[in-house]
């Protein structure tokens, strides 16, 4: 797939959102590249971030790799997305390619993770339904 840019939603200030294009790092030998198909929007936490009413003294979520750090602008946020594995690192089973997965990731078009951070979805499971797994 070569060099990949990801388009990510950033909350930049209260009631301000923008789409930023950023290059992804090189795929590691133990990683997979996922193309996002859909992501769910939280009417709770994400609305607080959008409105600027989030707790600035708390971490976003240290258990989700894409959300490490504090609540401060600019902030890429979101934590429920479904995608398809498009590339596998050299140490990853190639049979994972084209498999549908759930991931705790911000709203972004592409991301890189290790397979152990993904939930493989059964064949025929709709992406829209899978977004509500958490």
Question: What feature does the model see in each segment?
Answer:
Residues 38, 99-101, 110:
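Residue-level marker of beta-strand positions
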Residues 95, 104, 123-134:
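A glycine-rich, Thr/Ser-enriched phosphate-binding loop motif common to dinucleotide/cofactor-binding enzymes
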Residues 104-115:
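A structural motif shared across PLP-dependent enzymes of the aminotransferase-like
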Residues 21-23, 112, 120:
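Generic structural detector for well-ordered beta-strands
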Residues 1-74:
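Short N-terminal strand-loop motif that marks the start
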Residues 75-104:
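A glycine-/small-residue-rich N-terminal strand-loop-strand element
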């Amino acid at each position: 797939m070569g060099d990949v840019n990801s388009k990510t939603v950033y909350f930049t200030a209260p009631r301000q959102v923008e789409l930023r294009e950023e290059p992804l790092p090189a795929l590691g030998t133990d990683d997979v590249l996922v193309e996002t198909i859909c992501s769910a929007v939280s009417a709770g936490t994400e609305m607080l971030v959008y409105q600027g009413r989030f707790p600035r003294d708390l971490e976003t979520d240290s258990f989700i790799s894409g959300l490490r750090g504090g609540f401060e602008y600019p902030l890429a946020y979101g934590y429920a997305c479904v995608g398809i594995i498009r590339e596998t690192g050299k140490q990853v089973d190639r049979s994972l390619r084209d498999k549908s997965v759930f991931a705790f990731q911000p709203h972004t078009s592409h991301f890189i993770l290790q397979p152990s951070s993904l939930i493989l979805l059964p064949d025929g499971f709709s992406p829209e339904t899978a977004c509500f797994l958490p």
